[in-house]
Amino acid sequence: MCLLKQLSAAKMQSLSSLILATTAGVALGGNVVSNSQSAFVHLFEWSWGDVAQECEQWLGPKGFKAVQVSPPTEHIQGAAWWTRYQPVTYNLISRSGNETEFASMVQRCKEAGVDIYVDAVFNHIAAGSGTAIGGSKYGGRATPIYRAAGTGAGSPQDMHHSDGDVGKNCGVSDFRDKHNVQYCDLVGLPDLCTSCDYVKKTVVAFINHLADLGVAGIRIDAAKHQDAEELGSLLSAANTSLFCFQEVISGVGEAITPEMYTNNGAVTEFNYARQLAPNFLDEGKLQFFDGFGEKWGFLASDKAVVFLDNHDTQRGEAKLTYKNGGLYQLANIFMLAHPYGYPKVMSSYAFAGTDDGPPSSPVHSDGGVACSAGPGQDAPWICEHRWTAIANMAAWRRSAGTSPVGSFQKMAADVIVFCRGQTACVALNRLSSPWSGNAKLSLPGGSYCNVIESDDTSSCPQVQVNLDGSVNLQIPAMSAVALHTGKQANTTLILT
């Protein structure tokens, strides 16, 4: 089973001592994630070389925990983004690079303090027939990934299929029917029998190979379309040091729910964005975020991976994406400031059509990056994780640690202030005009960088917190002020 349990630093230290005292020769992973003090980034469709440079030059220094990368396995040819989600073999050759480049990226990121999470696709295989990006031939249910022992031919028995006809199968058509969702073909993609011995061994070998290369975690694509117990059995046979999170899209009245998968690992909480977005899009609703989290009907915080949008939803149901500019940035600030779940920041490329693939130009070149500098600014790669306000919230979140939200203050219908313990406070203004006023914070007295604008302690805009915690806040329109003890500008105090 994949690592999931969230532990405090004290408990981790105690557990480590116990393990050292009572076990020998047992490989235990160091990838336990404390959701309330970490964040990761999805570098969608980045090359392995670009990911490695980004870990070294940006993600590591900024304090991000990990990177989710696009599926590294051999896939069908084509420019559309979704070609990556039609695997032909589990060879590590893709639009992003080859296995040597992949392995180098994993190690370089690890040295920079950044883990790699792989988007793993093993619910299905590629549809149709042809030659894959690495030269492998494929043909639907006769794909080279799965070969009958000793025959050299594809084995249709490795797929779910219709009774009496191994060459055909039903299609997913009724989300109220569990069997239909999990044993029929999703949008025509041959559905793997992940409980079948040969398939299970093949997938486990693939996952273990990733772990051997230093990969720290996997996102399980289309987990909803695999029986939770069968998936759990497969994962329990794989490297147990990996952090796993499962894509389970929830829907009203559907037979399959995210809660069915929490025994296997973390789960994507799609309702997070669905409920958060309207409260940012509509005026006057920021005040209602007091009590936000599990009370809103979400998964338990330590089981949830949260996001505003992902590579699928930004082309579909998502109400907030980079195209919403400053409002999207403000919602990201809130997500990174709030302790619920393990937040994932989407890093997009510019697209007009829903099928558009990534830019042909690299992100890193000639010492610069082809990224937008902030909301509303054009560039081939959007790189939301590089927007100053979002990037600097990773360190803010680390400063907040495991502390819950305290002293939630409603300054106006669309202006809120809250702190996390005595180390981090944030004020958000969704108004179309600046807001100024006095608030009471739990921070020690001193001068702090407003990291929304800069985290350079020698030149950042400063906010003075008095010894009693009182502060005068000047918040620009559709923006925020974020202060934490990791970025104090100086030690000058004002006595009150």
For each predicted feature, which ranges?
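Aromatic- and acidic-residue-enriched carbohydrate-binding clefts of CAZyme catalytic domains
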Residues: 35-38, 75-107, 144-193
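Short glycine-centered, acidic/aromatic-flanked micro-motifs in structured strand/loop junctions
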Residues: 43-45, 92, 222
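Intrinsically disordered, low-complexity acidic segments that are enriched in bulky aromatics
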Residues: 126-131, 135-146, 247-249
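Active-site mouth loops of central-metabolism enzymes
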Residues: 40-49, 189-200
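Cleavable N-terminal signal peptides of Sec/SRP-targeted secreted and luminal proteins
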Residues: 5-6, 11-29
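Active-site-proximal helices and loops of the catalytic beta/alpha 8
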Residues: 19, 25-40, 54-60, 64, ...
